[in-house]
Regions:
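Acidic, low-complexity intrinsically disordered segments
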Residues: 2-201
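Conserved SAM/AdoMet-binding glycine-rich loop
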Residues: 4-6, 207-354
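Flexible glycine/acidic-rich beta-alpha junction loops that bind and position SAM and/or redox cofactors
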Residues: 13, 77, 108-111, 182, ...
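Hydrophobic residues within beta-strands of alpha/beta enzymes
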Residues: 67, 101, 120, 217-220, ...
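Aromatic/hydrophobic pocket-lining residues that form the small-molecule binding cavity
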Residues: 87-90, 202, 244, 278, ...
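Catalytic cores of alpha/beta
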Residues: 111-116, 276-282, 351-370
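Conserved, mostly hydrophobic/aromatic
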Residues: 178, 202, 297, 379, ...
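Terminal RNA-binding accessory module
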Residues: 400-490
Length: 490
């Protein structure tokens, strides 16, 4: 049984799988294939970018018994060295390979006519693959955590087939699905059933990835890391700092010489409701992680009307308190040149109840944060994507383009660039920059990290090598720098 996995890339509210990230999807699928009896050497993995660049891969697909395509973007993104698969490309694959292809991932939420096919998995693609190989069944179902326990370990070795291995970031899942009773109007995470993995299972997966050569990890596949293994009490659910400490300690023991351990996704409401537990968790993260970490918070809007109409759960005063707590614990500078742990804020436009006043509300929130001397490592301003399965999908909100782009540029100029000058002042040595592309007389590079800064290094330098550089200037989300001699400890 020869199988080919095509990684068309995924980007979801609580999962990133666009290179240099590799999401859990292709790893679980490879594990399901091996668990079903396939030999590891017969499981092939290619990214969509590889396929475009190397026509020979089509011949391998032609000879395969099963082709599995992972794809889907449910949040908008811009990528430096990757182009996600297009609907047209998926349609071409379906037409060419017909009964021997399966397609899945968040692309299942698309309502494009070309995807109205029995080969598109409406639930978990990895479960559909396993059942097809073991039971000859084509019934859609959700996978079980006991299956992921096996598949995550058995499929870990597939990362060695990635074209950028070992310089890839492994996205790690702790749980998925939103545990809230009322969900944000736009989010696709509630469309997954809520399921939580055991700590030992996550650690075992990290160990398997590490033994396969992985050195870069992000605990990012969950909507709120601070709520992982939360405890039920008489007054509701509260975070469990002991569980987070066990998770991080276990990962460090399983991967003793890892180079990056970062996180993603923090619900600021957790901090507001449980500040003591949240502070303890943040301290644990700083103890075990690597510097340059970002706790991205889904604020989405500070307009009271928008907050109410879209089931958001946090108001401006609460946002500021959450930002203060993360700054208090994590703003000290780390050994790689960047602060240990800083918050990020996501702002979303095109929500119900939005007006011109919304833009002013959001700008005022960011100005207040800046005036307090607090730092935000990232401000992510984006337009909402609509899916029929979500409440927002039933409405249409007009976004005035000129207003949106003017607002975004204002935030860059007034907030982001001044903060970036504090986060990485001139003269700061940024370490472990991987050079990725050329742009005029500059070489573009980034650290392998969660939300890495783009660094424009003077000179045309060799690509795909690590280097250190000294900061010489600042712009929105990027630094200019000059190369410096790497330290002996790097």
């Amino acid at each position: 049984m020869r199988s080919v996995i095509i990684d068309g890339y995924v980007d979801e509210p609580a999962c990133l799988g666009v290179q240099p990230y590799i999401s859990p999807y292709p790893r679980y699928i490879a594990g399901a294939m091996i668990d079903a009896g396939a030999k590891p050497r017969d499981v092939h993995y290619y990214t969509i970018d590889q396929l475009r660049a190397e026509p020979r891969i089509i011949g391998i697909m032609d000879r395969a018994d099963l082709i599995v395509v992972v794809a889907g973007l449910t949040v908008p993104g811009r990528y430096l060295n990757a182009k996600p698969i297009t609907i047209r490309e998926v349609g071409d694959f379906i037409a060419r390979y017909n009964e021997k292809i399966l397609v899945g991932g968040p692309i299942r939420l698309s309502h494009e006519s070309v995807l109205r096919s029995e080969c598109v998995a409406e639930k978990d693609l990895e479960a559909r693959v396993f059942d097809r190989l073991t039971e000859k069944s084509e019934t859609d179902r959700w996978r079980r955590t006991s299956e992921i326990k096996r598949w995550s370990v058995k499929g870990a070795q597939i990362i060695q087939r990635h074209p950028h291995f070992p310089h890839i970031m492994c996205e790690i899942e702790t749980y998925r699905g939103c545990p809230r009773e009322r969900h944000c109007s736009f989010c696709t995470e509630p469309l997954y059933p809520h399921s939580s993995r055991e700590i030992d299972d996550v650690v075992d997966e990290v160990r398997a990835l590490y033994e396969s050569g992985a050195r870069y990890f992000r605990i990012g596949r969950q909507p709120d890391l601070f709520s992982y293994k939360r405890i039920e009490t008489n007054s509701g659910f509260k975070p469990d700092p002991t569980a987070i400490e066990k998770l991080y300690r276990g990962i460090r023991r399983a991967a003793p010489e890892l180079k990056v351990l970062h996180m993603d996704n923090l619900n600021p409401a957790t901090i507001i409701e449980y500040p003591d537990e949240s502070r303890e968790i943040a301290k644990t993260i700083v103890k075990y992680h690597t510097p340059g970490d970002v706790a991205a918070m889904g604020v989405e809007s500070s307009d009271p009307r928008v907050i109410h109409e879209n089931n958001l759960q946090i108001y401006p005063e609460d946002v500021i308190k959450a930002v203060e707590l993360i700054n208090e614990v994590g703003s000290m500078r780390g050994e790689n040149g960047l602060p240990e742990l800083l918050p990020g804020i996501n702002l979303l436009y095109g929500l119900k109840g939005e007006s011109k006043r919304t833009y002013q509300h959001n700008l005022e929130l960011l100005q207040r944060i800046h005036e307090k001397g607090l730092l935000l490592r990232r401000i992510n301003i984006r337009k909402a994507m609509r899916f029929k399965e979500t409440p927002l999908g039933e409405t249409k909100v007009h976004i005035e383009k000129r207003l949106f782009y003017h607002h975004r540029e204002t935030i860059k100029r007034r907030i982001e660039v001044p903060m970036l000058k504090e986060i990485a002042p001139e003269g700061t040595i940024i370490k472990e920059i991987l050079t990725e592309a050329h742009d005029g007389r500059f070489t573009l590079g980034r650290q392998i990290a969660s939300y890495p800064l783009l660094i424009r290094i003077e000179g045309i330098l060799k690509l795909r090598v690590f280097m250190d550089a000294a900061v010489t200037g600042h712009s929105h989300r990027s630094l200019t720098a000059i190369p410096v001699e790497r330290s002996a400890s790097t």
